[in-house]
Amino acid sequence: MKQKGLWFSRHAMTEEQKNSLGDVEINQINKTIHSAKELKAEIEANDIIAIVAPIELQREFLELAGDKPVITAVNDRVLVPQQDGTEDKLEFHFRKWERLIKIEIEKEDYIPS
């Protein structure tokens, strides 16, 4: 049976990213959320949770996903010189997926001296 993958990102998943996951049906969610709880039903309906999100949202996704893998893409940032001499273009080249295991956030007030 084909696995289902949730892709939470503003950008489309690249072919390289898709291919590296194997036979997975990707369902993209491209919207602003304040809490991963807003996507609880979608998280429950998918087998793999792939996200591009701030650390606090990553922690929430990890909590809600239970034993399901929550993964993030690792990319190389490559500056590509432009033929016309304009500013170099930034490209992201996919390297691998990393599975989030645990996220602890510890904060304190910062008061400049």
Where are each of the predicted segments found?
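Long, low-complexity, Lys/Arg-enriched
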Residues: 1-50, 57-113
